[in-house]
Amino acid sequence: MRAVFPGRFQPFHLGHLAVIEWLLSKYDELIIVVGSGKDSHTIYNPFTAGERILMIKKGLKEFNVDFTRVIFFPIMDSFTSGLWIRNLELYSPKFDVVVSGNPLVISDAREAGYIVDLPPMFNREMYNATKIRKLMLENNESWSELVPKSVYSFIKEIKGDERLRDIARNDY
């Protein structure tokens, strides 16, 4: 069976990693859908889709996760309920299961006739991308403990944390 795991991954963190490891132990293949594919350089979406795919690949490689069974697929947001899943059906390989804890994603997937699998929440209070971006905005380096080391290094290399602070200064 092939599962779809949608997320924004802004940034990719250890909670995402735990879900992906769990999914790969359960399914033959995994499509990681990188949402908000055209959005970047904002407070909520500071990283490009390409940067996020690289983060995920680096994190999986660091933890020796075999990602030969993983397909990466960026998708643009759709503000019409259910349209994102129809777009995914048009452009991605066929899939059987949608994996999410997001109520809107769950509703859209069920309405489209898909099996929905709820992933375990791996310490969601700690591993939360909004919290990580907030720590970056505060120039609090403790966010480094919430992401794979390779992701931390990559974000530092592209100055992603500085970018986020620059965006915040220019938005107000």
Curated annotation (Swiss-Prot):
<dbReference type="InterPro" id="IPR006418">
    <property type="entry name" value="NMN_Atrans_arc"/>
</dbReference>
<keyword id="KW-0067">ATP-binding</keyword>
<keyword id="KW-0548">Nucleotidyltransferase</keyword>
<protein>
    <recommendedName>
        <fullName>Nicotinamide-nucleotide adenylyltransferase</fullName>
        <ecNumber>2.7.7.1</ecNumber>
    </recommendedName>
</protein>
<keyword id="KW-0808">Transferase</keyword>
<dbReference type="GO" id="GO:0009435">
    <property type="term" value="P:NAD biosynthetic process"/>
</dbReference>
<keyword id="KW-0520">NAD</keyword>
<dbReference type="Pfam" id="PF01467">
    <property type="entry name" value="CTP_transf_like"/>
</dbReference>
<dbReference type="GO" id="GO:0005524">
    <property type="term" value="F:ATP binding"/>
</dbReference>
<dbReference type="GO" id="GO:0000309">
    <property type="term" value="F:nicotinamide-nucleotide adenylyltransferase activity"/>
</dbReference>
<comment type="similarity">
    <text>Belongs to the archaeal NMN adenylyltransferase family.</text>
</comment>
<keyword id="KW-0662">Pyridine nucleotide biosynthesis</keyword>
<dbReference type="InterPro" id="IPR004821">
    <property type="entry name" value="Cyt_trans-like"/>
</dbReference>
<keyword id="KW-0547">Nucleotide-binding</keyword>
<keyword id="KW-0963">Cytoplasm</keyword>
<dbReference type="GO" id="GO:0005737">
    <property type="term" value="C:cytoplasm"/>
</dbReference>
<comment type="pathway">
    <text>Cofactor biosynthesis; NAD(+) biosynthesis; NAD(+) from nicotinamide D-ribonucleotide: step 1/1.</text>
</comment>
<dbReference type="InterPro" id="IPR014729">
    <property type="entry name" value="Rossmann-like_a/b/a_fold"/>
</dbReference>
